[in-house]
Amino acid sequence: MKFTNAVHFLLDGEAVILTKAGVSLHDVETHAKKNLVIQHIDWKVEDAEKGGYPHFLLKEIMEQKKTIPKTSQINGEELKKIAKKIKVHKKVVMVACGTASYCALAAKYFFAKSGIQAQSYPAYEFLPFAKFCDKDTVFIAISQSGETADTLIAARSAKKAGAYVVAVVNARGSTLERLADTVLLVGAGPEIAVVSTKAFTSQLATLYLLAHEVGGSISLAQKNLKDLGQTLEGWLNQTLLNKVVALAKNIL
């Protein structure tokens, strides 16, 4: 991001040769030259810097007061399109790994409140159930990076069975994004710390919005997320940090 925001996302079977003369893209098997497909990412240099914080984890915790309400601005047309399919077919399957799997678990309850019985699986346990997917299945794959191997395997198996694949993903241009029929980009920005914070809560907020779109109460969901952002403004500040530091010192 410091040098360019123009990228080509490599597909399976592609290789890049870098020389002083420039960049060339080739097919791994045939060695035939291919055209670069340039896309531009909207992340800024400061998004990938600590911004005065001692480490990325603290920065990303503090950013949630902005990233959660920002989710309320997610592509409304995509939400409506997915919600329409869910309301017609009423068959929702969600998969994810690690922290993202808790989003899927929580979303089961969001959808239940909207009258939809959704299922969730850890991606690495899904393959035996892939055969139950069909053209009436809305399959939601959740991943911060969009490159989680088990989630990709599950998504491919569901798509092969005829399911409509939705990606809830944070990183732009990922394999999952390219694989999916529809993408909900959560837009939390780069998450560099190993522990997921803002990406997790933004993914959770995205599924909350989708469930409310299904239930016909999207305006309420958007208001709730904006209100939560204002509440977090009062919590995630230097005063709180000072209290936490003092408490930690007392414990130690």
PLM features: residue spans?
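N-terminal segments that mediate ammonia production and transfer
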Residues: 1-86, 100, 109, 113-115, ...
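Glycine-rich phosphate-binding loops that contact phosphosugars or nucleotide phosphates
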Residues: 84-233
